[in-house]
């Protein structure tokens, strides 16, 4: 079993321990089961951010204050848990994008979404790396689709206002954010990593419309 999944532990301990996968709508769970699921997600988010993807399910259970069987009933494998956290992140960003559409300044609304995305990515690099390395975590996410649609609307709005260069598209955003994450990741050798705030502002400046000027090589 790889480090991603940690130690394999049977999760069916009794007749009651029937797996409830992440395909189950959390809203259909009993109130106590829903609370336990939320506690597991909160603990997993904290443990992954602090210790990376090598965290075992038993550690998450201890941090959540529940039995390991409870963790496995909701998330039979670590990948299921990561999928739920990724979907939760997409939902958070989509809500931010929806709010940004209400900003009368289209450019300011777009920048607000990008800053929030960069901040969350920097604070929880383990989940960010998992989402980049394991594309299957994100392929079936309805929240990801919603985020993409809202991001496209934000970009078109900023372009229509003249605040953003016309050749930028929503398809460029994931690559830019991955580049930002890699450039600002802490490392053991070489020069210190640039802060994500500084790198992001440089990137945003590059999305402004190009200024008119004389091309190199022209006559004076």
Task: Indicate residue ranges for each PLM-predicted region.
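Basic, helix-initiating cap at the start of DNA-binding domains
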Residues: 1-63, 80-83
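Amphipathic alpha-helical interaction segments
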Residues: 39, 59, 108-116, 146, ...
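An amphipathic alpha-helix adjacent to DNA-recognition modules
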Residues: 34-42, 49, 53-54, 74-95, ...
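Short hydrophobic/aromatic patch on the recognition helix
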Residues: 65-75
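Hydrophobic alpha-helical connector segments
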Residues: 84, 91, 95-123, 136-139, ...
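Short linear capping/connector segments at secondary-structure termini
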Residues: 129-138, 217-219
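Amphipathic alpha-helical packing segments from all-alpha helical-bundle domains
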Residues: 135-186, 194, 198
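C-terminal peripheral helix-coil segments that are non-catalytic and often amphipathic
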Residues: 1-24, 148-160, 186-220
């Amino acid at each position: 079993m790889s480090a991603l999944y940690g130690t394999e532990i049977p999760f069916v301990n009794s007749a009651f321990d029937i797996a409830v996968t992440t395909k189950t709508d959390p809203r259909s769970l009993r109130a106590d089961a829903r609370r336990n699921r939320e506690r597991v997600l909160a603990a997993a988010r904290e443990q992954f951010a602090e210790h990376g993807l090598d965290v075992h399910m038993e550690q998450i259970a201890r941090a959540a204050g529940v039995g390991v069987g409870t963790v496995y009933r909701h998330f039979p494998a670590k990948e299921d848990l990561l999928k739920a956290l990724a979907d939760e992140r997409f939902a958070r960003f989509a809500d931010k994008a929806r709010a940004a559409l209400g900003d009368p300044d289209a450019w300011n609304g777009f920048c607000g979404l990008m800053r929030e995305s960069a901040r969350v990515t920097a604070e929880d690099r383990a989940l960010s790396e998992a989402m980049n390395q394991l594309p299957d975590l994100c392929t079936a996410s309805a929240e990801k689709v919603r985020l993409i649609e809202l991001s496209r609307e934000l970009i078109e709005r900023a372009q229509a206002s003249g605040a953003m260069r016309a050749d930028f598209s929503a398809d460029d955003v994931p690559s830019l954010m991955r580049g930002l994450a890699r450039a600002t990741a802490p490392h053991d050798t070489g020069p210190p990593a640039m802060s994500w705030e500084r790198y992001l502002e440089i990137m945003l400046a590059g999305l402004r419309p190009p200024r008119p000027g004389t091309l190199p090589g022209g006559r004076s």
